[in-house]
UniProtKB/Swiss-Prot annotation:
Positions that bind Zn(2+): C33, C36, C68, C71
SUPFAM superfamilies, A to Z: MAL13P1.257-like
Family, as annotated: Belongs to the UPF0587 family.
Organism: Drosophila pseudoobscura pseudoobscura (Fruit fly)
Recorded domain comment: Requires a bound zinc ion for normal folding and solubility.
The protein, known as: UPF0587 protein GA18326
Entries under InterPro entries matching the protein: CXXC_Zn-binding_euk
Length: 163
């Protein structure tokens, strides 16, 4: 079992908080089999609120289950409960772990942010739902505070964590 953290960094303009629509946010990732090294070509979604039952060893199921096409090993990933945290104005421009994955036989290697993010403007301004970060930048106008808000230079990476 390996714990892998998803870290993000972005420049926030007039934004207090950026977060996923947890627990229903689908994390789109590309994966590598830890056993044989086979890397998936397609994006897989992992959602904390969804459980799949594929294994008799774990009656609670998993957030994601996949059998490797190359070595046939059965692998799973769970999102660690209460690990999903917001990215705040204080974090702007710095890498921060926003969610932790409990990986068994698989490791995420690439992340696609897509839509489903929530943005909260500074000074009790407007909040925006279902924000799409697939272009790594997002800009909108906060009518409550009469200023522009934006997420710029969005980047992500995965890091292995100690237990």
């Amino acid at each position: 079992m390996v714990r892998v953290g998803l870290q993000i960094s972005a420049t926030l303009e007039n934004i207090d908080k950026l977060e996923t629509s947890h627990p229903d946010y689908p994390f789109f990732v590309k994966l590598t089999c830890s056993n044989c090294g086979e890397q998936s070509d397609k994006w897989h979604d992992i959602t904390e609120s969804e459980r799949v039952q594929q294994d008799t060893r774990n009656t609670a199921g998993f957030n994601f289950f996949m059998k490797c096409k190359m070595c046939s090993r059965e692998n799973s990933i769970d999102i660690v409960e209460k690990s999903n945290v917001p990215y705040t104005a204080d974090d702007s421009g710095k890498l921060k772990t926003i969610v932790i994955f409990d990986c068994r036989g698989l490791e995420p290697v690439d992340f696609s942010p897509r839509s489903g993010w929530k943005v909260f403007s500074s000074e009790n301004g407007q909040s925006f739902e279902d924000v799409d970060l697939s272009e790594d930048d997002w800009v909108e106008y906060d009518q409550k505070n009469n200023n522009s808000v934006g997420v710029y230079e969005f980047v992500s990476k995965f890091i292995k964590l100690k237990k």
